[in-house]
Regions:
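Proline-aspartate-enriched helix->loop->beta-strand connector
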Residues: 1, 15, 118-135
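Short beta-strand and adjacent tight-turn residues that come in two discontinuous sequence segments
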Residues: 19-20, 105, 132
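Alpha-helical scaffolding within the catalytic cores
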Residues: 3-4, 60, 114-121, 146-153
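Extracytoplasmic substrate-binding proteins
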Residues: 4-83, 114, 165-234
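Active-site/pore-lining binding-face segments in mid-to-C-terminal subdomains
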Residues: 129-192
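Short, structured coil segments at secondary-structure junctions
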Residues: 12-13, 98-99, 159
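Short, surface-exposed alpha-helical segments at coil->helix boundaries
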Residues: 3, 28, 85-92, 149
């Protein structure tokens, strides 16, 4: 489908269109491919190596998590938090990689995903943690709903104050768009769910990532602002 869409676009605009596999575990290959294509092998190789090392490190550490200790997570999407995606979806790759248990027992939808669920279903799943997705133009919507609406207060995650907003600077760290920001998102979420196993200095990791990928030096204040609703200030 993606190839046919690319061909249609190419036919319409009359210039070459390239389709890239955006799977999280293949981000290193994406950078290597792009480096070859545009003649920036050295720079692409640096970014590819970072992606590969980061993913491999998380995968290996996640093997240490006992099944009974795995954290149950609900991914709250859409404008009200009543849309989500199940395990194995392209939209939940970060959660799957770090060893979280996706509580959403729903059919997998293609494309944009976003299966509609009811609050009653979420109450029956009763997750340990809720991750809220930030929609453009609705920056505080889902997080505010989940943390202030009395209907959500019955959930274990709400009672334990374990509702978090996924960072979204400059792109989402978890999903939509499936960018390289998911690489720092993996380290953030791994630390958040399993601090005894993943001992990343997330403040230092963030600064390193932004400098490497965006040529931007984050200040301590910017780091704290990004993490304000995403698990608190870094250690």
């Amino acid at each position: 489908k993606s190839i046919s869409q690319a061909e249609n676009i190419q036919n319409q605009i009359g210039i070459p269109v390239v389709v890239i596999n955006g799977e999280l575990t293949k981000m290193d290959q994406v950078y290597e491919f792009l480096g070859d294509m545009i003649g920036e092998k050295a720079r692409a190789g640096e970014l590819a190596a970072y992606c590969r090392q980061s993913v491999n490190d998380v995968v290996e550490k996640a093997k240490q998590i006992p099944q009974e200790k795995r954290v149950r997570v609900y991914y709250a999407e859409g404008s009200t938090g009543l849309e989500t995606d199940p395990k194995g979806s392209q939209h939940t790759q970060v959660l799957d990689l770090v060893g979280g248990v996706n509580v959403a027992d729903v059919p997998m939808k293609g494309g944009m995903g976003l299966t509609t669920v009811s609050l009653e279903q979420i109450l029956s799943w009763d997750p340990d943690v809720i991750l809220t997705w930030t929609m453009a133009g609705n920056e505080e919507g889902v997080y505010k709903i989940v943390t202030t609406d009395p209907k959500w207060a019955k959930l274990k995650a709400s009672k334990d104050s374990r509702v978090y907003e996924i960072p979204n600077n400059p792109f989402n760290w978890f999903d939509r768009p499936p960018s390289s920001n998911r690489i720092i998102g993996v380290k953030w979420l791994a630390n958040l769910l399993y601090p005894d196993i993943f001992k990343y200095d997330i403040k230092a990791e963030m600064k390193d990532f932004y400098a490497k990928f965006y040529h931007y030096n984050l200040t301590d204040q910017e780091v704290e602002a990004i993490l304000e609703r995403a698990g608190g200030k870094p250690n």
